Amino acid sequence: MKIRIWLIAAILLLAGTAGFVAGRYFSDNRKPNFSEENVLYVYPEMTVDQVKDSLAAGACVLRPRSIDRTFKKMEVASKIKPGRYIIEPSATSIYVARMLVFGWQTPQNLTLSGTIRSKGSIARKISSQMMVDSTSIDAALNDTAFLAQYGFTPENVFALFLPDTYQMYWTASVKDIFDRFKKEYDIFWNADRLAKAEALKLTPMQVSVMASIVNGETLKSFEYPIIAGVYLNRYKKGMKLQADPTVAFCFDYTLDRILKKHLTVDSPYNTYKYKGLPPAPINVPNKGCIDGVLNPDKHGYIYFCASPEFDGTHRFAVGYNEHLKNAREFQRALTARNKAKAAGK
């Protein structure tokens, strides 16, 4: 009788133990352990406890002990990989542990957009979205030897960057990032665009320089090919381009208004003083501006000025007298607007 009782007790104990082990296995390996999606950023200096805290705060861990067990089992503390990880609500504890140990990252969107007129702006935009710091990016942008491997210099490196959204891993190194931009540059400059540049008797770099001037003149994309046509007309005629954005560049974009006295600044970038194109882009031109130069409107316009409607558009003219008429109309509108503003104070 006693033997039977002990046997039953042993069976129950084994069954209980098996159930306990199976329960833990199910909890750690099969059962989702997060209540919502979370983006987890793991920095190189982070400890496993900091990662756990970040998980708990962002993904709302349902069973913290399951995380503790699986992290210990997978030796996450010593094997964790920096990265950007997407934690889905359906993720199990063991999956997240493996994700961190094997570095199963989700690519990050890196977006370059808006007006980019300095290397510092490039560095800040990249570092704000990636793990690399702005100092490292800025150093690369000014490193002659580093840029030479991509065919660029610290002076013309603006041309390398084509504003868009690209996917890459958050932990990408400086070289990884520049490799990607060079790859995208080579893809963009396909046979068709190269042929169009050649037809204009311009190199891809010269096209980018011209595009940067267009980019500095207007925010209206429909005007890109029109303004490009104006500057190409001047260029072909051997005229000075007389582009205000190049003067702004000479003063590091610190001028509120470009006055007559600023037009005499002695710089190879000053197109009021020197004929031809500046030696390098004056900003990072977007793809639309580049294509605007490659596909310019065919017209006879030589001049243009801001519209008196103050809507960001321009009025164009073939002759100088027509241009003066447009300029005077704009000046009258500007004076009237300034008076109205002053009266309203």
Segments and roles (model prediction):
Residues M1-I3, Q105-T106, G114, T254:
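Generic structural signal for short, solvent-exposed loop/turn connectors between secondary structure elements
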Residues A10-A15, G58-A59, P82-R84, S136-L141, ...:
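N-terminal start-of-chain detector that recognizes signal peptides
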Residues M1-A9, E37, Y41-P44, D53-A59, ...:
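Intrinsic structural disorder
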Residues G23-F188:
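Signal peptide-directed extracytoplasmic domains
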Residues T47, S128-T135, L147-K345:
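Bacterial extracytoplasmic/cell-wall-associated proteins, especially those involved in peptidoglycan
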Residues W6-A9, E37-V42, S78-I80, K119-S121, ...:
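Short low-complexity stretches enriched in small and charged residues
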Residues M1-E36:
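N-terminal type II signal-anchor transmembrane helix
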